[in-house]
From Swiss-Prot:
HAMAP family: IHF_beta
Known partners and oligomeric status: Heterodimer of an alpha and a beta chain.
Pfam families: Bac_DNA_binding (PF00216)
Cellular component annotations (GO), alphabetically ordered: chromosome; cytosol
CDD domains (UniProt xref): IHF_B
Function of the molecule: This protein is one of the two subunits of integration host factor, a specific DNA-binding protein that functions in genetic recombination as well as in transcriptional and translational control.
Protein's name according to its UniProt entry: Integration host factor subunit beta
Gene symbol of the encoding locus: ihfB
Length: 93
């Protein structure tokens, strides 16, 4: 599902809201989540899951085009861990 598909579905479920209101709300929720993760904080949505940052250690990689070894810096990557309710819904559907 893309962001625009999500907005369309929400508009059809909540016809009293304009498409612009729904779009602005979805964008704001995603922006707040990104800002929270950018600040190094964790996001927990009970029943759905949690978003956090995992650190990837520096490592030696390889350029697939040339085969040369390349040093890769350490970095933080977003990580999602599904909650129990979401795992159960996915496994029983």
């Amino acid at each position: 599902m893309t962001k625009s598909e999500l907005i369309e579905q929400l508009c059809s479920k909540k016809p009293q809201l304009s498409a612009k209101q729904v779009e602005d709300t979805v964008k704001e929720v995603l922006e707040q989540m990104a800002t929270t993760l950018e600040g190094g904080d964790r996001i927990e949505i009970r029943g759905f899951g949690s978003f956090s940052l995992h650190y990837r250690e520096p490592r030696l990689g390889r350029n697939p085009k040339t085969g040369d070894k390349v040093e890769l810096d350490g970095k933080f990557v977003p990580h999602f861990k599904p909650g129990k309710e979401l795992r159960e819904r996915v496994n029983f559907s």
